[in-house]
């Protein structure tokens, strides 16, 4: 395998499948099976999961006139629901899994402790981080960048419903072009909304590459961790980053 330790960022929407909300059991089973295959191949896997399949903080706050911080705390609890559900699925696939949360809830999960998380990874356990960063006004993408830096992950794999980063929304713009390679600055300058700017800045500061790939294609988690050129790679232009050559200009597919 190409990588020793990775962080997989799963959006809550990725767990919905074709449902309008909630969790699709078949999608959950598929993700768990692929994560288990990666772990059995010797890769240490940490996961940050969102909660958008249950609660959309900013959208709900705007619609109901709800305080933004309160809406964000509700969203953090939604991520814990997803984390516990994902833990159960991965353990049914045969891989021991721990959930660590940024908000204490000792009856159902461990508190987030960096050294303990790393120790779990070294023992071959999957670690799922729930409750975001524990702070309102920060996204789970920022949490992914933060936790990846803390546990010394080599890369963030951001699993989405599209096969990479485009110069426009491919759902509404059929002529949109997909980028194979981008720099952090490209993402910020072009406002490509791969992740929020705080998350991108954290990755840039820590030279932490990001790979955006399509979760809906079976086997893609295993393939992307193997190092197959799937999706869009984001990193420093001047660094080779695990054997991926630095780009000159952006290369649209």
Swiss-Prot record:
Chain sites annotated for binding ATP: 9-12, 52, 56, 160, 166, 169
One GO CC annotation: cytoplasm
Annotated positions binding UMP: 51, 72, 133-140
Regulation: Inhibited by UTP.
Keywords: ATP-binding, Cytoplasm, Kinase, Nucleotide-binding, Pyrimidine biosynthesis, Transferase
First-listed, main subcellular location of the protein, grouped into a coarse class: cytoplasm
Pathway annotation: Pyrimidine metabolism; CTP biosynthesis via de novo pathway; UDP from UMP (UMPK route): step 1/1
Subcellular location: Cytoplasm
Pfam families tied to this protein: AA_kinase
Any GO MF annotation of the entry: ATP binding
EC number(s) stated in the UniProt entry for this protein: 2.7.4.22
GO biological process: one example: UDP biosynthetic process
Top EC class, one word: transferase
Catalytic activity: UMP + ATP = UDP + ADP
Cysteines engaged in disulfide bonds, as pairs: none
Protein origin, superkingdom: Bacteria
Subunit structure: Homohexamer.
PANTHER family named in the record: URIDYLATE KINASE, URIDYLATE KINASE PUMPKIN, CHLOROPLASTIC
Job description of the protein: Catalyzes the reversible phosphorylation of UMP to UDP.
Family from the record: Belongs to the UMP kinase family.
Full protein name: Uridylate kinase
Species for this entry: Synechococcus sp. (strain JA-2-3B'a(2-13)) (Cyanobacteria bacterium Yellowstone B-Prime)
Top-level taxonomy: Bacteria, Bacillati, Cyanobacteriota, Cyanophyceae, Synechococcales
Gene for this chain: pyrH
